[in-house]
Amino acid sequence: MAKRLVEELERDGIVKSERVKRALLTVPREEFVLPEYRMMAYEDRPLPLFAGATISAPHMVAMMCELIEPRPGMKILEVGTGSGYHAAVCAEAIEKKGRIYTIEIVKELAVFAAQNLERLGYWGVVEVYHGDGKKGLEKHAPFDAIIVTAAADVIPPALIRQLKDGGVMVIPVEERLGQVLYKVVKRGDKIEKKAITYVMFVPLR
């Protein structure tokens, strides 16, 4: 089932690199959804978790992962851990060589994600934190890449500050006509923003 889904994403031009393709084929999405949704794990759509959160659709996970151009040795911050699936895909995309710090505001979700990641062997590559993702994780900054999996009103200044020079942030931003996914690149004091597509995420709390 995973193979068919990934082939479709490849055909649609969403999966572009071997790294992301391999990561999606390696991470068992059914292990990151609630038991009642296991049969739907390889449908290309978001699925409910709890506390109003969702696990992102596979095409969105693939797209965001491709946009940061994953490579071994990267230090990545994820804001909005959810069930831990996206962090696991990123871990595989960097070949588990590097570190992913992920922060979740809902304590029950942070615990759920940590249990999933530990059970599946991602402990030591992925670190889960409970806290306010808008503030980032100053103690581990700067980051090569930041992925935000909830829609912000504005790009949080703390996240821009914690991005390495030349680093990439992928973030959905709430705008007048809807949410827009941006690829943000930091160049010294300048920020380059590129609109990618319209999206629909839960709000960044």
Swiss-Prot record:
GO MF entries: protein-L-isoaspartate (D-aspartate) O-methyltransferase activity
The keyword Secreted appears for this protein: no
InterPro entries in the record: PCMT, SAM-dependent_MTases_sf
Pfam families on file: PCMT
GO CC, alphabetical: cytoplasm
EC class name: transferase
Transcription found in the keyword field: no
Entries under SUPFAM superfamilies matching the protein: S-adenosyl-L-methionine-dependent methyltransferases
Principal location listed in the UniProt entry: cytoplasm
Catalyzed chemical reaction(s): [protein]-L-isoaspartate + S-adenosyl-L-methionine = [protein]-L-isoaspartate alpha-methyl ester + S-adenosyl-L-homocysteine
EC number assigned by the record: 2.1.1.77
Sorted UniProt keywords: Cytoplasm, Methyltransferase, S-adenosyl-L-methionine, Transferase
GO biological process: methylation; protein modification process; protein repair
Entry's localization field: Cytoplasm
Location of the active site: S56
Domain of life: Archaea
Described function: Catalyzes the methyl esterification of L-isoaspartyl residues in peptides and proteins that result from spontaneous decomposition of normal L-aspartyl and L-asparaginyl residues. It plays a role in the repair and/or degradation of damaged proteins.
Protein family (similarity comment): Belongs to the methyltransferase superfamily. L-isoaspartyl/D-aspartyl protein methyltransferase family.
UniProt protein name: Protein-L-isoaspartate O-methyltransferase
Gene it is expressed from: pcm
